[in-house]
């Protein structure tokens, strides 16, 4: 059965490649991917939630950011299907994720991290992050397609760009 998730990337301008993203390090207590670097903020939708409502809730719960709807830029949808074994039982996941970009100024050291979810956060240059994810040089559970969506979006660090056109990315995982 398919379920929805909201993925919120926090980005800011930098001089190196033009953009850097805020990564969260998942809590060591998480069932899945403990201690791995991940999306700035993400979570499953609650019953009746829209993607946007879920995104606003998650960024508030995990990082203490009280964003407004117009501050989240919709980058599109991603579909992911995965199969495996989780705690000795077959695991089948089919999710559709709405990917958002938040570019208002954020000071990582002033965030209020939800300890049960987030161990730490760090800024990383977008190009370096893409390379690290492709090479597996940092422990991560990041879908490279999301970093590509950020890169392909027009000037991702410009807040509320009215010339932006919604792009939908959909591809099944192997």
Regions found by a protein language model. Give the residues of each.
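Conserved Nudix-box catalytic region and its N-terminal flanking loop in Nudix hydrolases
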Residues: 1-7, 17-62
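Short, conserved, surface-exposed binding loops centered on an aromatic residue
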Residues: 10, 64-66, 89-92
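A generic structural motif
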Residues: 11-13, 103
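Short, solvent-exposed loop/turn segments that connect beta-strands within catalytic domains
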Residues: 13-20, 89
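Short, flexible active-site-adjacent loop segments at beta-strand->alpha-helix junctions, enriched
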Residues: 14, 27, 78
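Secondary-structure boundary elements
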Residues: 15-16, 64-68, 107-110
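Nudix hydrolase/Nudix homology domain
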Residues: 35-37, 41, 78-174
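A short coil-to-beta-strand element that immediately follows conserved catalytic motifs
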Residues: 66-77
